[in-house]
Amino acid sequence: MSSSDIDRKIAVIFATDLVGYSKHMENDENATLRGLRECNKIIEAIIKKQKGRIFNTGGDSVFAEFPSAVAAVDTAVEFQKQIKARNDKDTTDVKLEYRIGVNMGDVVKEGDNLLGDGVNIAARLEALAQPGGITISKNVYDLVANKTKYEFNDLGIQKVKQNQFHAYDLLLDPSQKRKLKTQSSNTKMIAMIGGAIAAVFIGLFFSGVLDTETKLDSSNICH
């Protein structure tokens, strides 16, 4: 199949996943399943309201596309707020939390499903997000920062698995502000370590040369 046969488009992708699903199921299966159904109804209603479309689900995860970056980010914020309100009212010990990632990128259409880097990076952003938090890519940030009143925290260049991207946290609360190691800082650290090792070897080399020359000089004097 040639690239011209692949149906591509640019899309804003929303990815969310339940934190600690397996552990919740082990602790209280009935309460977890009930809570999951409630949360699914909440997210479905918000996505529909924002004119989004769910294109894939995985039990405790949801992937949706949106007509605009603002709509996707508004959905993420509203969902997290409603989940928090639900947890505050829930009398069980099962407090469900979600991570959310939002990205805009190139995707491949496969029937009603979407695939490709645009979706993969949204999933990586979701994995990078804090429980109850939202993490977005720089291209989404550039579109929404001046159109919304949300606060953001620049996380710099991040690498998750094989994907590298510039990420931002959307701060629902000041306590969510954090600092992560960036890919550039990791590169600098490797360079510094490499430089230090090189300096040691150079020092040992010249030390050996000087020691050899000293021995030769001593030998010549003895003769």
Predicted regions and their residues:
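Short, Lys/Arg-enriched, disordered terminal segments
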Residues: M1-I6, K181-T187, S218
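Intrinsically disordered, glycine/charged-rich C-terminal tails and inter-domain linkers
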Residues: G132, N139-E213
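Catalytic NTP-binding/metal-coordinating core of nucleotidyl cyclase/transferase enzymes
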Residues: S2-T75, K81-Q82
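Acidic, proline/glycine-rich low-complexity intrinsically disordered segments
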Residues: V209-H223
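Catalytic beta-strand-to-alpha-helix segment of the class III nucleotidyl cyclase homology domain
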Residues: S4, K41, F63-F165, D169
